[in-house]
Regions:
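Catalytic Walker B motif of ABC-type/P-loop ATPase nucleotide-binding domains
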Residues: 150-154, 159, 184
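Helix-to-loop junction immediately C-terminal to a conserved catalytic motif
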Residues: 49
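Helical segment within the ABC ATPase nucleotide-binding domain
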Residues: 164-179
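Conserved beta-strand
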Residues: 6-9, 16-26, 33, 57
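Conserved ABC transporter NBD signature motif
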Residues: 57-68, 72-73
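ABC-family P-loop ATPase nucleotide-binding domains
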Residues: 75, 81-138
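Walker A (P-loop) phosphate-binding loop of ABC-type ATPase nucleotide-binding domains
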Residues: 36-40
Length: 192
């Protein structure tokens, strides 16, 4: 089964066109979207997430055709963007409590395990976290609600090589059972 299928998708802007893009991401795989800044990687991910509308083409996420996927399918997506997106006034512990309300399959024990594994202080305000720590928090959150498909948009850019390698190792662990998949956009070819 494919975790993600894009068939002939198009999105036109005044100064940019994503033109007839097709690809699939099978379960048990990591698919890389690579390109320079402005090449359409984030546009593609925003289309997959339903944040912007398609001009034409079809997208299927975990077997469900878009343009908007059901809450059940959305609950099976783990999304990590280049910014974690959690309020800086919160702590990692508070983020976990908030996400427990948002995801029916939230696994607090798994989340706490990732916080410990990554050395993330649960009571420290996120404003005091480094960029690498915030990215680790995003990965911990994405992996703690039984997501089937991880979507990472430039999630490794700006990270030091040790943190980047650690994150990439985690992605390899994530797909080992052939029941999960990853879509990773980057302009860093060594990430792929």
């Amino acid at each position: 089964m494919n975790a993600l299928e894009l068939r002939d998708i198009c999105k036109r802007y005044e100064d940019f066109t994503l033109d007839h893009v097709s690809f699939s991401v099978p379960m048990g795989s990591i698919m890389g979207l690579i390109g320079e800044n402005g090449a359409g990687k984030s546009t593609t991910i925003n289309l997959v997430l339903g944040l912007i509308g398609l001009d034409s083409g079809e997208i299927a996420v975990l077997g469900e055709n878009g343009p908007a996927v059901s809450p059940k399918v959305k609950a099976q997506l783990g999304v990590v963007l280049d910014e974690a997106g959690f309020p800086d006034c919160m702590t990692a512990r508070q983020v976990g409590k908030m996400l427990r309300l948002a995801y029916p399959n939230w696994q607090q024990k798994t989340y706490d395990g990732y916080l410990a594994r990554f050395g993330l202080p649960p009571q420290k305000p996120l404003k005091d976290y480094s960029r690498g720590m915030k990215m680790k928090l995003g990965i911990a959150a994405a992996l703690s609600h039984d997501a089937k498909l991880l979507i990472l948009d430039e999630a490794t850019s700006g990270l030091d090589p040790v943190v980047r390698d650690e994150m990439l190792d985690m992605l390899l662990e994530f797909i080992q059972d052939e029941q999960h998949a990853v879509l990773l956009s980057s302009h860093i070819t060594s990430d792929l």
